[in-house]
Amino acid sequence: MEERDIFRIEVTDADKGKRVDKFLVEKLRDRFSRAFLQRLIRDRNVLIDGEPRKNNDAVKPGEYVEVVVAAPAESDIMAEKIPLKIVYEDKDLLIVNKSAGMVVHPATGNYSGTLVNALLAHCKKKLSGIGGVRKPGIVHRLDKGTSGLLVVAKNDRAHRLLAGQFKAKTAKRVYVAVVKGVVQFDNGVIEAPLARDRKDRKKMAVDFDEQRSKSAITRYHVLERFKDATLVEVTLGTGRTHQVRVHMAHIGYPVMGDVTYGTRDGLKRPMLHAMTIGFIHPSTEKFVKFTSTPPRDMKELIEKKKRV
């Protein structure tokens, strides 16, 4: 059976009367291009109440629009010679300093320009297969807009041992972020369960419904306060999707530039950087740690805030 991804989006009162194609572009612009969405509609892969719809059909509040997208086959994922910032590499793994704007692995509607495409060119076939054809070598992810360190497994044994540490929460992951507002306390722990947003499946939200949510723990430490922003160090106790971004917004200090959970603030991406990663090496069985400094855009923002 063909593997598929299905996106189910609720139509709200604010969407009343919008054309199906325009509605989908608004809701899925971060994931798919306009041309790709229009092709899905033409191919009868956009449904309302189980019936295919046309571009100019109007949506109604209370309806659910379903978008059905075939997952990429192995042949769809090509090796691409994309420059990589490799911090460390051996026979078991490599540490990549991912640039902001790079997607980690191919997904529906986005098959090229990803970290996986670059890894296929760099490592040839020396990547773990546990993640499947779409995610070879990928042990954990970073959001598209997040820069920083990410570990990649080059064989299945390394993948299992590394993934086990992430699951057991023994791997060390530290982020640095510039958040909006002056954080009151020097240190804090945010314990708030997360689940898919009930109205927007692309987003996560704090949700105390035990049937839907998963526990999430984030610890933060203030590094420097500015007039209207704060530089914080954030350590993950769990590794949920969008965890840092949702938790910081939840306590009133959204990551600057995060248009999904805060405001754009005149920035091109969320000011969030995966600064440190540490784990037990699968072969040496010794703890190793890698650190990277924030990229230029974050450094420039920090210097700008210092001058205010």
Where are these regions (language model features)?
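The conserved catalytic core of RNA pseudouridine synthases
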Residues: G132-G164, A171-K172, A195-I251, A274-V308
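Flexible glycine-rich active-site/ligand-binding loops centered on an Asp-His dyad
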Residues: S112, K172, V176, K180, ...
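RNA pseudouridine synthases
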Residues: M1-V189, P193, R198, M271, ...
